[in-house]
Amino acid sequence: KAPGMIGWWPAKAVTFVNNHDTGSTQHMWPFPSDRVMQGYAYILTHQGTPCIFYDHFFDWGPKEEIDRLVSVSTRHGIHSESKLQIIEADADLCLAEIDGKVIVKLGPRYDVGNLIPGGFEVAAHGNDYAVWEKI
């Protein structure tokens, strides 16, 4: 079960990495810029209703990376109440399977090959995240 609102009441949870109220535009309390895509890998593949921050999509430049994650989510019908199974959770790794169709790795651990079952291929990856989809 996921922590917080998405674990407690996923149908009502709205997830986001940044928005105009977090002060990111004024650089007051921004989400760490080197972790933004890790955040999107999480919210676009997990429970809840994800919101993409306009500035991240149109101004920052990771539009293609975000598009790939949205495509995976759409292709596999991930929704606010998708089934989440935590495969591994450590200080350097969070590995989860969603609806038996998508696997998400967050964290710096690189060697997770023995944890990924056969029949999955990498669909998206970046700084400390990777997403596999069932083929």
Swiss-Prot record:
It comes from the Eukaryota. The record marks 21 as: Transition state stabilizer. Its cofactor is Ca(2+). Substrate binds at residues 1, 7-9, 20, 26, 105, 132. InterPro entries: A-amylase_bs_C (IPR012850), Glyco_hydro_b (IPR013780), Glycoside_hydrolase_SF (IPR017853). Keywords: Calcium, Carbohydrate metabolism, Germination, Glycosidase, Hydrolase. One of its GO terms (biological process) is polysaccharide catabolic process. Binds 3 Ca(2+) ions per subunit. Its EC number is 3.2.1.1. It catalyses: Endohydrolysis of (1->4)-alpha-D-glucosidic linkages in polysaccharides containing three or more (1->4)-alpha-linked D-glucose units. One of its GO terms (molecular function) is calcium ion binding. It is an enzyme of class 3 (hydrolase). There are at least 4 types of alpha-amylase in barley. Monomer. Belongs to the glycosyl hydrolase 13 family. This is Alpha-amylase type B isozyme. It comes from Hordeum vulgare (Barley). The lineage of its organism: Eukaryota, Viridiplantae, Streptophyta, Embryophyta, Tracheophyta.
